[in-house]
Amino acid sequence: IQPFLFRFHDMQFGLAHNGNLTNATSLKKELEERGAIFSATSDSEILAHLIRRSHNPSLMGKIKEALSLVKGGFAYILLFEDKLIAALDPNGFRPLSIGKMANGAVVVSSETCAFEVIGAEWIRDLKPGEIVIIDDKGIQYDSYTDDTQLAICSMEYIYFARPDSNIHGVNVHTARKRMGAQLAREFKHEADIVVGVPNSSLS
């Protein structure tokens, strides 16, 4: 159950992960050969072990190195004692947004609809390959790669996201209506009934 909590002898942190790593099998095998012990089958643990085993002297250096090694679509949130760090994959496959509460607290979510529930104001979406660091100094933006493109997974609009969320400026419900209209234009068949893919894609 996320978030995962990691307690190493020299660091501890929490980790939440949305996505899938395409090189999870090879990374896990390599880490296990180097002595890493995994407590579950989830690929979410891989980033934590890569951070811990990095020889980079700085925490941000360790995180950037680890992020450059994992491949696939992912959004990570890491919680340390004095900061929260969020990161997005180089293609922006998964959405990740920054918001702010009325009291100044900064929040991060994979869906903008969560901000409305807690009374937060949307600030902006993370860009592909971007890292955001949130601490007592405020919000700082950084990146771990320049090899990026925005290629959001179409399933976010079709199925994963709630209809009242916005992804990179596009409302999910509106996107679904437009896709349905385009589908009707391309496939001119008389249908008895048209239904969405339950449950989360119904809007």
Predicted feature descriptions by range:
Residues 1-128, 133-198:
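Conserved short alpha-helical segments that host acidic/polar catalytic motifs at enzyme active sites
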Residues 202-203:
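Carboxylate/His-rich catalytic cores and anion/metal-binding grooves
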